[in-house]
Amino acid sequence: MWNNRVILSGNLVRDVEVKVTEGESGKHVANFTVAVQRTRSKEDAVDFINCVAWEQVADYLGSYGKKGKRIELEGRLHTRSYEKDDKKIYITEVYVDDCHLTSNKNSNEEE
C-alpha cells in the first residue's frame, strides 16, 4: 500500500544535469524543477515543484530531459532540513521513482 505517493505531469523548467555524489559510491543524481499547471483555478497558475532522481532515472533524464519537455513522473514526497545563519531551513521535494518524457509543450512529438 502506498502511503506517500505523488504523480505529476508538467514541463521541465530547464535542461536536466546529472551530478555524481562524493565518496566511494559515487551515485548519479539529478535535481530539476517541473512546472505544473494548476487545475480548478480561476487564474492560470503554475506550481514549480523541485524533484530529485537517482541512478538510472537520473541518467535517463540527463540524456533526454530538455527544457520545455513534457514529463510524467511518479515518486514520493521527501523532506529535509539544514541550518543557515542559525535558522532551520526546510525543503520539500519529490524523489522520483519512475518517469516518462513525452513531448515538448508545443509539439506533438513522442519520446
Task: Describe the function of each predicted region.
Residues 1-111:
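Single-stranded nucleic acid-binding surfaces, predominantly the OB-fold ssDNA-binding core
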